[in-house]
Amino acid sequence: MHSTTPISSLFSFTSPAVKRLLGWKQGDEEEKWAEKAVDSLVKKLKKKKGAMDELERALSCPGQPSKCVTIPRSLDGRLQVSHRKGLPHVIYCRVWRWPDLQSHHELKPLECCEFPFGSKQKEVCINPYHYRRVETPVLPPVLVPRHSEYNPQLSLLAKFRSASLHSEPLMPHNATYPDSFQQPPCSALPPSPSHAFSQSPCTASYPHSPGSPSEPESPYQHSVDTPPLPYHATEASETQSGQPVDATADRHVVLSIPNGDFRPVCYEEPQHWCSVAYYELNNRVGETFQASSRSVLIDGFTDPSNNRNRFCLGLLSNVNRNSTIENTRRHIGKGVHLYYVGGEVYAECVSDSSIFVQSRNCNYQHGFHPATVCKIPSGCSLKVFNNQLFAQLLAQSVHHGFEVVYELTKMCTIRMSFVKGWGAEYHRQDVTSTPCWIEIHLHGPLQWLDKVLTQMGSPHNPISSVS
């Protein structure tokens, strides 16, 4: 009796070098894909003397120092393996260290690495032990005073209201990434389809975008790296000359907090880190999408498998849909990829058309007006929320009253339109005038705010639709 052998297997051959390297593979999924990725790498490394030996040394002795193992950088920075494109250091970190790795945002190079992916050199290091995985920082609890020493006359509410109502333009300012982002990032990535602007604050102040006025300042104008000021407050946000008041100048205005007389309120990660609602003009369409995966794709296609990592807008129907909306929906395409990594939220435009984002947290970090709408071109990504920044602002705000803390709820909502933008440079004044847009609610920060506000008790001035 003869066994039947597929014709393809007669001609398939795995080299001994590939077999050895696959011995260190992590996880048991996508065996064929991993084999092809390693085979592609071996062909490149065999052209370099000692490269294969160095890689095997790194994989067999992960605790020992090892040298860079490099391959040439492609034009777009990516590597294609079996009809899938990805960044090379991400691919090989996934093969040999972290099978669940989703994005380059989750990786940081070690100091010993001479050719990290972000260094714009002709060679890229793919040694998986020259990268570390970003850890989610532990946020310190917010200390809420047990006894209210709050003086409404010294509240920063006027400053927040100034930015939120009186000074907010009828049409938001616009900024385009990366042109308007003049502050150089601490660790910039090269321009590529997976280019991410993952800036962390380097200096105490950020430049305004070319279209942003120098005043009024954002109500959140504090350095991220500077510890919160002592409990000082000013009566108004600006002097008669229109310049922002230096909070450190009025050192005689002190809100006394008895030492140790406070309740700590801790941050907790919710089951669903965000929810996404889809709108067409001012009409809500479909059910709210609850995101449990840290990597979520929002696209214009249909997905009959009901993948929990995808929110497919192509499935949603609307009897009031006009031709402009229909045409816009056809251009959403691959849409936007949302990542929640290390306490930070990134939005990556994977559509062929730009996306437009309004995030107060992002605008604060870059010194823009709070209502600024940022254009993210195809192939670029932007950090749209930073938990550590939010934690610091919340810790500062609890000493200025209920209303000031409540204002931070606006930071926990991100609005994003597809294909069509809005603001001063567009004929659409408001996001509700754009054909297709989404509203993202960040559950962790919102629930943290809710717990802090509950501890603070009722506001001195009741919150209303006009407050």
Curated annotation (Swiss-Prot):
This is Mothers against decapentaplegic homolog 9. Phosphorylated on serine by BMP (bone morphogenetic proteins) type 1 receptor kinase. Keywords: Cytoplasm, Disease variant, DNA-binding, Metal-binding, Nucleus, Phosphoprotein, Transcription, Transcription regulation, Zinc. It is linked to Pulmonary hypertension, primary, 2: A rare disorder characterized by plexiform lesions of proliferating endothelial cells in pulmonary arterioles. The lesions lead to elevated pulmonary arterial pression, right ventricular failure, and death. The disease can occur from infancy throughout life and it has a mean age at onset of 36 years. Penetrance is reduced. Although familial pulmonary hypertension is rare, cases secondary to known etiologies are more common and include those associated with the appetite-suppressant drugs. PROSITE patterns: MH1 (PS51075), MH2 (PS51076). It comes from Homo sapiens. Residues 16-140 form the MH1 domain. The keyword Oxidoreductase does not apply. Expressed in heart, brain, placenta, lung, skeletal muscle, prostate, testis, ovary and small intestine. Also expressed in fetal brain, lung and kidney. Changing residue 43 to E: In PPH2; affects SMAD-mediated signaling.
